[in-house]
Structure formats: C-alpha cells, structure tokens
Amino acid sequence: MDASAPLTAVVAFVHVAEHASFTRAADALGVSTSALSQSVRALEARMGVRLLQRTTRRVGLTEHGARFLLRVRGGLDQIDQAFAELDSARSVPA
C-alpha cells in the first residue's frame, strides 16, 4: 500500500476498533454507519487485507488489524499532540 490512504479512513478504522461497533463509532464521529463502513472497506481494499472481523453481534480485529491499530494509533496521537502544541503556541503572545 502506498502512503496515500485517506486519513479519514484510518481515523474511521481506529474508532471502529476502539468501540468494537460500527454504530457506536459512527455516533462518536457524527457520521452514518454506512459511510463509516464504506470508509473502512475502502481502506481494507486499498491495503489488500481485512482489518476487521465482522459478525452480526460484534466487530473484532484481525491479526493484520491489531498490528495496524498499534502503528496508526501512535501516529494519530502524535498528530493530536502537534495540534495541541500549535493551539498552545497560538494562545501565548509573541
């Protein structure tokens, strides 16, 4: 996979993984369940692997999904930290 996977799809995947539910993740993100599902499916298609194991009752991580989550969660945390630092710097007079 190239590095051009949409960040929104990665964020969608992380939310589904953390909530273990498309419905709860969609509610947390303020998007429809179908839009969230399409985003994750597109990410899986782009990567060529299944990230999530879906059943009628729950959503779990595949082995690939668990490894991917560990890697991207740290990256997303760094992005959040960068925004927080910029917000702090902006509120301090120069």
Go through each PLM region and give its residues.
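Interdomain hinge and pocket-entrance segments immediately C-terminal to HTH DNA-binding domains
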Residues: 88-94
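Short alpha-helical "packing" element that flanks the helix-turn-helix/winged-helix DNA-binding module
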Residues: 9-16, 68
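Hydrophobic two-helix hairpin corresponding to the core of helix-turn-helix DNA-binding domains
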Residues: 10-13, 25, 62
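Helix-turn-helix DNA-binding elements, focusing on the entry/boundary residues of the two helices
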Residues: 21-22, 40, 54
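Alpha-helical residues within the helix-turn-helix
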Residues: 27, 38, 45, 66
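Short helix-boundary/capping micro-motifs
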Residues: 15-30
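A short LG(V/I)-centered, amphipathic sequence patch enriched
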Residues: 44-61
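Residues within the DNA-recognition helix of helix-turn-helix
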Residues: 32-42
